[in-house]
């Protein structure tokens, strides 16, 4: 059986925490920032975890994670 391929876009966006959860960055922080409040932009800096319903799909894209 051939090796499974890693989804390269997903590999750049997700990392695993020490406890095995999948970490992600928040969206909406790269441009059109003038209308967003400072508080909202600070919130984008904080990382977040992938929702439990999405974990299976991410793991399928990243078989060697």
Swiss-Prot record:
Membrane-spanning residues: none
Record-linked Pfam families: Ribosomal_L35p (PF01632)
GO annotation terms (biological process): translation
Gene Ontology CC: cytosolic large ribosomal subunit
Gene3D superfamilies according to UniProt: 4.10.410.60
SUPFAM superfamilies, A to Z: L35p-like (SSF143034)
GO molecular function, one term: structural constituent of ribosome
Alphabetical keyword list: Ribonucleoprotein, Ribosomal protein
Source taxon at top rank: Bacteria
Xref: HAMAP family: Ribosomal_bL35
Family: Belongs to the bacterial ribosomal protein bL35 family.
NCBIfam families: rpmI_bact (TIGR00001)
Protein name: Large ribosomal subunit protein bL35
Origin species: Magnetococcus marinus (strain ATCC BAA-1437 / JCM 17883 / MC-1)
Gene label: rpmI
